[in-house]
Regions:
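Paired small-residue
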Residues: 9, 20-28
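Extracytoplasmic gate region of multi-pass secondary transporters
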Residues: 133-189
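Cytoplasmic membrane-interface "Motif A"-like loop-to-helix N-cap segments
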Residues: 1-3, 208-219
């Protein structure tokens, strides 16, 4: 269902005629991503891993997700150079459909009966927020997600607007980056490339030091870095 929500959001977005319509449809896409993205994958890996290896396992899985960021941004820009943005949305929606065809082939793990696991969402959320530890983690990951979304949405546009035209004789042009929008996509890809090594290293550190302090340091350094870049 979540994947269908993701696909539907992408397809319907091709008919959007205003920024407000795009923002509304982004909510639908967001619901789809919430049920199919890295958050769900990390939860599964976290439960399946032992306490000793959990931190490193999560780091490796996150690094694999960064490979998608490294490849996805330049691929999207390449497709935008060939097709209209509506067609690119359809292409990505079709790629999600292809992944969905593989899901029935995966072996399901036996779960508890529906009666045993059926709990209202209101009760689950209420119990979670009664725990101060969850509230602190929630605020931390809210800041993390906000920063990631902000960088992903605005950093390529900032690079596109602030950089001058790329010279045909430049090294960038030689490697196929001929426009400032292409340079913006490359910038996001470089962030993903760096994140591959950063998340694996963070996973290793998580096996050696308290994770809450590591998270605090990572978030603080990211905030300072983004602030310095803005200035």
């Amino acid at each position: 269902r979540q994947a269908l929500c993701y696909v539907s959001g992408l397809i319907i977005s091709t008919f959007a005629q205003s920024p407000l319509a795009h923002q509304f449809l982004e909510l639908i896409i967001g619901f789809g991503i919430a049920g199919t993205g890295m958050g769900m994958i990390l939860a599964v890996v976290g439960r399946a891993s032992s306490e000793k290896n959990r931190s490193m396992a999560l780091g490796i899985v996150t690094a694999a997700g960064s490979v998608g960021q490294m490849v996805g941004a330049p691929l999207a820009q390449f497709l935008l150079n060939l097709y209209e943005w509506q067609q690119v949305f359809i292409i990505f929606a079709f790629s999600i459909v292809l992944v969905m065809t593989v899901v029935p082939l995966l072996k399901e793990t036996p779960v508890s009966s529906k009666k045993e696991i059926e709990v209202s969402l209101t009760k689950v959320v209420g119990n979670a927020f009664k725990d101060p530890n969850f509230s602190m983690i929630f605020l931390g990951f809210f800041a993390c997600g906000y920063q990631l979304a902000f960088v992903s949405a605005h950093f390529p546009a900032m690079v596109t607007e602030m950089c001058s035209a790329i010279s045909p004789s430049s090294l960038l042009h030689y490697f196929g980056v001929s426009t400032t929008s292409g340079l913006g996509a490359l910038a996001i890809a470089l962030i993903g490339f760096s994140n591959i090594f950063g998340t694996i290293y963070a996973g290793w550190l998580g096996q050696k030091f308290p994770k809450k302090y590591l998270l605090a340091i990572v978030y603080a350094l990211r905030t300072l870095t983004v602030s310095y870049t803005h200035l």
